[in-house]
């Protein structure tokens, strides 16, 4: 029998709270997913939606709290005011206590990351968590990480990102041995900063069996789907993500203007509408909604705060697939194996002959500004 995945859902998260989170959960169930939900939030607001969705009510356990993290709360403020009793904290804590397999929230990203780090802590051998995004490409989909959890990365951290991203690709993209590339300013081996070149050297020397490292990739390779996993540090990754989102919005606006300019344009749209609908679906960010927090001793999915019911259901389905494939256990095993290989390798050093220095705390992304 298919394993039941226990998902802890922050029902109060995002711009719309239960209005979107609960119908989104109900829609995910309609796809035949075997899920048991732990719902955290205000029972007065949640119960009407459970009454409207009996299939959801049948597989849900409600845990009442009237404390919710606001979208404009600073991480430190959220930790102080709602650390032990907010719907966000309680959903993460359910993962820590093994009451849930994975947590999903559409809440404030900074607060969610701060709470996840405080509650779950990082895995052994991982300095900092990362946010992994699913990226629509010409070939299908690609995992890109880190897209904004922290700034800067030494060689070891980039190798860890490659390992975690490959494990996620196996779970979400169903690729047995994912191809992995390091994002760089060129594909030539001599290009890039020292840490990126050192990470490339380590990945080649370690020859990890669970991934196929192909070398450097450029920004244009992300959309082309050249590799299954693109690895970068959070500053560059976040810029790439926001640029892609802006470009998609820009192209959509161009198309709308071009197809409504005059009568002939409108007639052209009438004949091309089926193909344009396919294009729209391909570019729809809701189909890849859900950033995955990796590197923690537990997995948290961040749904977009503005997401609608469909987008929320996609984030929940991603959480389901990740939990079904026991991503956390895969990452633990792969990291342990890689650290063992690195400790044996006489050349597990950076290009300059010294170990890459750990990124200072001050270089980490300051979400609490």
Curated annotation (Swiss-Prot):
GO molecular function: phosphate:acyl-[acyl carrier protein] acyltransferase activity
Keywords from the named record: Cytoplasm, Lipid biosynthesis, Lipid metabolism, Phospholipid biosynthesis, Phospholipid metabolism, Transferase
First-tier enzyme category under EC: transferase
Annotated metabolic or biological route of this protein: Lipid metabolism; phospholipid metabolism
Positions of the UniProt region annotated as Disordered: 342-369
UniProt keyword Lipid metabolism present: yes
Compartments in which it is found: Cytoplasm
Primary location group: cytoplasm
Any Gene Ontology biological process: fatty acid biosynthetic process
EC number: 2.3.1.274
Catalytic activity: a fatty acyl-[ACP] + phosphate = an acyl phosphate + holo-[ACP]
Entry's Gene Ontology cellular component terms: cytoplasm
Function: Catalyzes the reversible formation of acyl-phosphate (acyl-PO(4)) from acyl-[acyl-carrier-protein] (acyl-ACP). This enzyme utilizes acyl-ACP as fatty acyl donor, but not acyl-CoA.
HAMAP family: PlsX
Subunit organization: Homodimer. Probably interacts with PlsY.
UniProt family annotation: Belongs to the PlsX family.
Listed name of the protein: Phosphate acyltransferase
């Amino acid at each position: 029998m298919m394993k039941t995945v226990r998902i802890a859902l922050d029902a109060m998260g995002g711009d719309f709270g239960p209005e979107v989170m609960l119908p989104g959960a109900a829609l995910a169930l309609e796809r035949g997913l075997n899920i048991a939900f732990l719902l955290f939030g205000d029972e007065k607001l949640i119960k009407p939606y459970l009454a409207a969705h009996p299939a959801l009510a049948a597989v849900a356990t409600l845990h009442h709290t009237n404390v919710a993290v606001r979208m404009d709360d600073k991480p430190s403020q959220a930790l102080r005011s709602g650390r032990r009793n907010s719907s966000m904290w309680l959903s993460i804590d359910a993962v820590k206590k093994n009451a849930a397999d994975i947590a999903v929230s559409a809440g404030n990203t900074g607060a969610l990351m701060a709470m996840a780090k405080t509650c779950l802590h990082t895995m052994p051998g991982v300095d900092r968590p990362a946010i992994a995004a699913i990226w629509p490409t010409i070939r299908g989909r690609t995992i890109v990480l880190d897209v904004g959890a922290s700034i800067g990365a030494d060689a070891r951290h980039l190798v860890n990102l490659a390992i975690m991203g490959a494990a996620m690709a196996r779970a979400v993209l169903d690729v047995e041995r994912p191809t992995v590339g390091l994002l760089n300013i060129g594909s030539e081996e001599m290009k890039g900063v020292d840490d990126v070149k050192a990470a490339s050297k380590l990945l080649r020397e370690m020859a990890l069996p669970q991934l196929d490292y192909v070398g450097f990739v450029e920004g244009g390779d992300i959309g082309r789907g050249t590799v299954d996993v693109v690895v970068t540090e959070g500053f560059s990754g976040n810029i790439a993500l926001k640029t892609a989102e802006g470009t998609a919005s820009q192209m959509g606006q161009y198309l709308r203007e071009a197809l409504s300019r005059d009568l002939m344009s409108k007639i052209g749209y009438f004949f091309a509408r089926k193909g344009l609908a396919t294009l729209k679906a391909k570019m729809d960010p809701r189909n890849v909604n859900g950033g995955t927090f990796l590197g923690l001793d537990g997995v948290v999915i961040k749904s977009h705060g503005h997401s609608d019911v469909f987008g929320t259901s996609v984030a929940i389905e991603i959480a389901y697939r990740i939990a079904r494939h026991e991503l956390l256990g895969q990452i633990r095993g792969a990291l342990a194996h890689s650290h063992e290989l690195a400790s044996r390798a006489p050349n597990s050093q950076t290009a300059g002959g010294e170990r890459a220095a750990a990124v200072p705390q001050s270089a980490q992304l300051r979400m609490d500004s």
